[in-house]
């Protein structure tokens, strides 16, 4: 029978990652309800971790298939910022290798700000290569949002030091002479596209925080350019600023 206190057992269980750890057998024979409750929590943590690992490996299937087909340099492409009334579209291209093991990487919209910030730094450190590109509001107004997004995505691919032999693109096919796999909701299906979505999101959020200081009164650091009540109130009071998209309603109503 375990001689540790329930609190000590709970602390030990929090550090165990191997389901075959011999200490677990001892804890299972411990009749104390607190120990058994801690074991149940431990089992649930292991199950959740296994599910996360399985989902991670599933999101790696497109990359693995392409590597096995001989495409050593595969880039995942995603964008952030198609819907806001203000600010640029930001696109990112990320190249990973088979050693990449950040299980938490998934669609940036499913992550908390803290999770994104942590993963962003890890992706920059562990990816083979990362490149970013932007399409500013003026270009969006000139081309339309879809064409501007395509243009920025192509820029992010061309900015890579080594040109990829295959692209995995979130939803938007690109007019570029590189073989492509286009995935609807690609940031939920491909790990490299998910990594690109995280980097693009963090970079754009940082830009919008800078714009918030340059153009106060619209709440850009909080709404990221989306049409929130505070943003619309700022438009009503101040009119449109240089980063507003003049072709996105209701912005034209506030252009001086």
Curated annotation (Swiss-Prot):
Its cofactor is Mn(2+); Mg(2+). Pfam families: RNase_HII. Its EC number is 3.1.26.4. A divalent metal cation binds at residues 78-79, 170. GO terms for cellular component: cytoplasm; ribonuclease H2 complex. One of its GO terms (biological process) is mismatch repair. Residues 72-256 form the RNase H type-2 domain. InterPro entries: RNase_HII, RNase_HII/HIII, RNase_HII/HIII_dom, RNaseH-like_sf, RNaseH_sf. It catalyses: Endonucleolytic cleavage to 5'-phosphomonoester. Keywords: Cytoplasm, Endonuclease, Hydrolase, Manganese, Metal-binding, Nuclease. It is an enzyme of class 3 (hydrolase). The keyword Ribosomal protein does not apply. Manganese or magnesium. Binds 1 divalent metal ion per monomer in the absence of substrate. May bind a second metal ion after substrate binding. CDD domains: RNase_HII_bacteria_HII_like (cd07182). One of its GO terms (molecular function) is manganese ion binding. The keyword Membrane does not apply. It is found in: Cytoplasm. Endonuclease that specifically degrades the RNA of RNA-DNA hybrids. PANTHER family: RIBONUCLEASE H2 SUBUNIT A, RIBONUCLEASE HII. Belongs to the RNase HII family. This is Ribonuclease HII. The lineage of its organism: Bacteria, Bacillati, Bacillota, Bacilli, Lactobacillales. The gene is rnhB.
């Amino acid at each position: 029978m375990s001689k540790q206190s329930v609190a000590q057992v709970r602390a030990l269980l929090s550090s165990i990652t191997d389901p075959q750890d011999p200490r677990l057998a001892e804890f299972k024979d411990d009749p104390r309800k607190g120990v058994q409750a801690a074991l149940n929590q431990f089992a649930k943590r292991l199950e959740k971790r296994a599910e996360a690992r399985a989902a991670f490996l599933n999101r790696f299937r497109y990359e693995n298939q392409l590597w096995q087909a001989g495409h050593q340099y595969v880039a995942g492409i995603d964008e952030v910022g198609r819907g806001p009334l203000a600010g640029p579209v930001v696109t990112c291209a990320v190249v990973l290798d088979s050693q990449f093991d950040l299980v938490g990487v998934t669609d940036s919209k499913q992550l908390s700000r803290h999770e994104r910030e942590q993963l962003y730094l890890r992706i920059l450190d562990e990816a083979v290569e990362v490149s970013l590109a932007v399409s500013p509001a003026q270009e969006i107004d000139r081309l339309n949002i879809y064409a501007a997004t395509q243009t920025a995505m192509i820029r992010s691919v061309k900015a890579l030091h080594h040109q990829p032999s295959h692209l995995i693109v979130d939803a938007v096919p690109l007019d570029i002479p590189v073989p492509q796999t286009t995935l609807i909701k690609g940031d939920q299906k491909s790990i490299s596209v998910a990594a690109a979505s995280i980097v693009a999101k963090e970079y754009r959020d940082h830009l919008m925080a800078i714009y918030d200081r340059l153009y106060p009164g619209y709440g850009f650091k909080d709404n990221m350019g989306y049409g929130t009540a505070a943003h619309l109130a700022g438009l009503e009071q101040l009119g449109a600023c240089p980063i507003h998209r003049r072709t996105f309603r209701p912005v034209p109503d506030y252009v001086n």
